[in-house]
């Protein structure tokens, strides 16, 4: 009869050691940069988490390095697994090539943030950034 309590105790100890490793770690700020369509698009998501977030995008001209302040930016955050489409939101120009985008992450998981950037007189550009949202 002593064997069953020992097996149960061993199971509890094993779970106590394994479960903390399954938790989502605190996510550091996500920063990334891509050059596409004559623009450099830099993302800073400042510790993405479940709930409301503000993503900051900086857009500069790839050739002149000057800020692009006249772009129209829309964004969609799509959950990867399970694949769920997100709601499209618009970026707000803050001046000097800086745009803020309100994004809501429903759960702690990986998302693809798809940005559509349109400058007057230019072809539209689509950029995708992976973002890991924490709890």
Show where each model-derived region lies:
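Short acidic/polar inter-strand loop motif in beta-rich domains
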Residues: 118-126
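Residue-level recognition of secondary-structure-to-loop junctions
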Residues: 93, 105-107
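Aromatic sugar-binding surface patches on proteins
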Residues: 94-100
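C-terminal motif of bacterial Sec signal peptides marking the signal peptidase cleavage site
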Residues: 18-21
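Beta-strand-rich domain onsets/edges
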Residues: 23-56, 60-62, 66, 103
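Short beta-strand edge segments in extracellular beta-sheet folds
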Residues: 130-135
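Short amphipathic beta-strand segments in non-cytosolic proteins
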Residues: 74-90
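Bacterial N-terminal signal peptides that target proteins for export
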Residues: 1-11
